[in-house]
Structure formats: C-alpha cells, structure tokens
C-alpha cells in the first residue's frame, strides 16, 4: 500500500516507526504502528536497522530516539487514517472527477436560469434549494476522490518533512549543524566555459551548445536569450532545475537534460513548439507537466529511469506526431485513454513499471511496430480485446508478467516476427505451443479465433431459424384469427330473425 514506508527512501523514519511501540503506553496497543520486526522473521527489516545504526550510531541512544518518536506522531496518525480510506486514485480518475464537478456546476447554473424564467415564480427559492441539495449530493462522490488524492499527496509531503525533521534532530544531537548549513547553502557555480559560451552567443549566433559532463549545478537564465539555438545538450550534470527562461529558445529542436538531479520540469517547456527530441531520462521526476502536451512537434520523448506514476491525461490528444516513447523503469500504474490518439507512434517501451492493464483505446495504435511491456510483474494480468488491431506490430515483449491468456484476435498480428512470453502463467496458448515460437502462437490463436467465430455464426443462424419459425407460426395464427373475425362479422351483419322466446316477459 502507499502508506507503507520504503526504508530506502525514508531510512530514519522507518527505523523510528518500527520501534515506536517501545515508547508508547500500553493503552495505545491498538495503534496502527506495527511492533518491531522479529529477528527470526526472514522478511524482517533487521538488516536495514543494522545498516542505519552503523551509519548513524547515535540512533541507539534512548534520548535521541525518544525525541524522534515525539516528532513522528503526525505521521502515525495520518497513516492510520489513509489505511482506512484506501489507496490513492490514479491521475486520470482525479482529472475525470474534476471535469465532472465542473459539468455539474455548469448544469446547476443552467437549472437556475430555467427556474428563474419559469412562469410560476412563487416557488423559485424552494426549487433552487432542492436543486442545490440534489447537486451537492451528486458531488459528494467526486469530491471524496479529490479529497482522498489530496490526503495522499499531503501524506507524501508529510513523510519527506518528517524524514528531514528527524535528520535535523540527529544532526543536532551529534552537534553537526555546520554540515547541515553547508548542505543547505546555495552553491552557485558557473564555470568559465559557460560564461564564454554566453559571450560568444552575444556576438555570433549559435545553433548548437554541448555542456555535457561539466558538473553544472545551475543553468543561467541568460541561456534563454540564445534564440538561434537548435540543439542544447546538458547531459550528465548536477542540475536540480531548468530555468523558466528556456521558453525563449523558440527554435530549439533537441533538448537533452538526462542524467541530472531534476525533480520537476518548468511549465514553460510547453512553449517549445518546434521541439522534436526531448530526453529527460535518469532524473528524479515524479510527474511530467501538463504543458508538455503543447510540444506538438515532438517525435521522440525519453522519460525513462525516473519516478513517474502517471502520464498527463491529454498527452495523446496533442502529441500526435510522436513516434518514439520511452517510459521504462518508472512507477506508472496506468496509461491514459488518450494514448490511443498517438497514431504516429511506432516504438513504445514501458517495461519495469507497475502497469495493471492497457486502455481499450490501445488498439488504435495501428502504426506501432515495437512494444515492450515486460517486467510489470503481478500488476499486468491481461490485455485488451483491441490488442489484435495492432496490425503493424513486429516485436512484442510480454515477459515477466501474470498474463493467463492472450487476446482472442492475437492471431491477426500478421507482421509479428519477435515474441517473448517468458515467465507468464499462460493457459492460452498452452506452453507446448509457446515453445514452438511466434508463428506457432499466431497459428494457434488464429485457428482458435476462427473456431470461435464459426461457433458464433452457427449460434446466430440457429437463432435466426428459431426466429423464422416463430414468425411463420405467428403469421398462420394471425391469418386464422383474421378469418374467424371476418366470419363473425358477416354473421352479425346479416341481421338474423329475432327469436320470439327472447321477447317473452319474465
């Protein structure tokens, strides 16, 4: 669950919370914090504890640990609440909830206008109140989604703040405040080469700048003024941010900021309308800005080796020229529905993520030639029925997942020449077919699909015959009924002589 701490990300906080019960009154035994792991438990975090204590020996001091325990009460309480409320909704669900709330508000305004224009205005206030109450009731579910997302977002910030707080407590305990001040001090290093480049650009137009491997920690704002720049290579530096002024590079075609320490990209990156190649791999990005969708000329986007959990909801609607998308080694749980609109996409690598499936729109990627979905492990269990529509697919890697059955129309992937299905609990097709290779798999799935279609056609024909039989019976019955009605009508219309017996008095 999202509430579980990763010792690698929060080493001190994990250590303190694991030992929290030893500093808690017996009456609080119902706390959500687990007792310290047993040394005999093979899944124990004892190795982590030994490692962190070795690195930070003062953690074992009771006074230090007690101070840290008091500083983690908010984390424990929040974690308990989130465990009750459930996991964080994905980005697309949140976006849809926001959109639905806007639609509801717009509908409410229209309702008020209709009520105000109604001829009977006596009950206007009452009608408006009832409508408002109904709308608020409808909004509860969508608001709860947004609220849950906000709680999880706040919890993640809380964890980071708590970890930093505990580190400060520890450093204060060992009287190492000087190191903290040194780490927090802003260090600006712009070497002579950077200054020289800026001076050269002021005198003569530059179309290419390569500053890779220079250990740069800062990119000067002045770079945004080199308007003739076409290629900017900042690979393998120590950059923590890209200045907003990069939006001034209106003619930029290629931007490489891979292998840095970037945690975010500026929203202004969306103003690079001519950008064709963007490499942001090997950073610390958790999201891509929504504005990246405005880079409509992008042909290649490499966002691999980051901490992304989702892609922008509308990325497929606007990046229609994208041919190559690299998002492997992230933490992406789902792909947006809009990805099906990337009709130019030929290469997609999404291995080593947390994908739990693909949207039905995925089958619209009819130009896709290479697809790697391997190593999504237990999260990826099936593929959409539209998967068979990927008619241009040549290479497919589905290894190391939990797929039990390939889609029925898999046999229609006539251009598929390379297929990896290793480490899947496949039932359809059976293992003996898989071992024979890609052609055997396609043939097996193709025959299976044809058999299914023939069976469906047979059932449809039987149904048509039954319907026809019922129609014939109904026609005959209707004909008989019409004949009977006609005979009765003729009899009544002939006015037979009245029976004298009926005229007798009782």
UniProtKB/Swiss-Prot annotation:
Sequence motif GVYW, location on chain: 437-449
Null allele phenotype: No visible phenotype. Pirl1 and pirl9 double mutant is lethal due to a male-specific transmission failure leading to a severe pollen malformation.
SUPFAM superfamilies in alphabetical order: L domain-like
InterPro entries in UniProt: Leu-rich_rpt, Leu-rich_rpt_typical-subtyp, LRR_dom_sf, LRR_domain-containing
Signal peptide: none
Function: Leucine-rich repeat protein that likely mediates protein interactions, possibly in the context of signal transduction. PIRL1 acts redundantly with PIRL9 in the differentiation of microspores into pollen.
Name of this protein: Plant intracellular Ras-group-related LRR protein 1
Lineage of the species this protein comes from: Eukaryota, Viridiplantae, Streptophyta, Embryophyta, Tracheophyta
